[in-house]
Amino acid sequence: MTHDLAASGLRFGIEEEFFLLDASDLDIVRSAPAGFVAACRDTLGEHFAEEMFECQVEVASPVFSTLAEAARFHGQARQRLAHLAMDFGLRSLCVGTHPFADWRRARSNPAAHFARLFEDQGRVARRSLVCGLHVHVEIPPSHDRMAVLQRVLPWLPLLLALSASSPFRGGRRSGLASYRRALCGEWPRMNIPPALPDEDAYRRHLALLREAGCIREDGQVWWMIRPSSHVPTLELRICDACPRLADALSLAGLFRALVGEALGAGPRTLPVARDACLEENYWQALRYGCAGRYLVGGRAVGAGDWLEMAWRQCRPQARQGNEWAYEHARGLLGETSASRQLRRYQTLRAAGQERHVALRRLVEELLEENLQPALAGPAGKRAHEGGRSFRPAAGAPMSIRGQE
């Protein structure tokens, strides 16, 4: 593979999850009104999907070649979903956790796929009222996806820190920048992937899990990064859903650059200390976000230094087309969604607002952020159309969305 293909030529896709709220009190709804799902399917087509709770939906993109394309599609999709929701007395909210919703009010989706999840995972699934951001980056067939995964993996806590948007749970401060990822840790096969060296080892591992009855299908391996089971991509799953679309686009661009660098790099041995440092860095990101101290190269560094190290490691070809993503991420170092939510809540409480009033105002501000226009790339182009579909080896078109 040439460095050009390993860089700006990498196609990608983005999946965003949303809560559905009652427009009157801004709490989650138990069920969407009759006709809402059908209206969403009519408007968003194959890019719309229901989720494991009836108060959640997902928008899965077509395939993009540039961040400007992604800005166009997702900017329009957020607007369309918001308008449809308002037509049905709802609001759509993209954030890691709803600041004051009670997970016990959420009604599980009765569809067979989701019913099996709740049967298998019990209360762990019931408690998982969270929204995430997933990014797919296409891996050329000449490269082994597990080998690329292992090269990218050590950087993932940095992406979590930048995306953190779930500091509240059930109306209380959780003490974590990403409470969503703490909940993910209750699930099997949802945290750090094992050190499998290549896709052959990965397939053998999946076969063992199926034979043992641990999983019903390959898609039930939910690691924070995984080879997709239905399209030729690596899927980033660690990030919280981003209230601001620009943040989501920045994370997609950074991940794409890191994958491009991994594709262009020669084979190397992973450090023995990887697991220990990765686990600690993951905790630092989950707990402190961009205020964490990260173990990199045998020393502790801040998120800003780590981001600069990540960008500096990427070859010019891997950076190409993703420069805006890095510049935007530098701005997130000063205030992520999680730290902004906490700051605003503290300001409102200090001004004498009751807790429930401050939390409602917080949701109102998050809803406003959801519809802020995103500027992707130096030209700041906005979009109204998407790209193509990934294709498997046989050549049949595929959607990036698959079973969770």
Swiss-Prot record:
Enzyme class: ligase
Pfam families in alphabetical order: GCS2
GO biological process: modified amino acid biosynthetic process
The keyword RNA-binding is annotated on this UniProt entry: no
KW Transferase (keyword) present: no
GO molecular function, one term: glutamate-cysteine ligase activity
Region (Disordered): 377-404
HAMAP family the UniProt entry points to: Glu_cys_ligase_2
Protein family membership: Belongs to the glutamate--cysteine ligase type 2 family. YbdK subfamily.
Function according to Swiss-Prot or TrEMBL: ATP-dependent carboxylate-amine ligase which exhibits weak glutamate--cysteine ligase activity.
Protein name per Swiss-Prot or TrEMBL: Putative glutamate--cysteine ligase 2
Species lineage: Bacteria, Pseudomonadati, Pseudomonadota, Gammaproteobacteria, Pseudomonadales
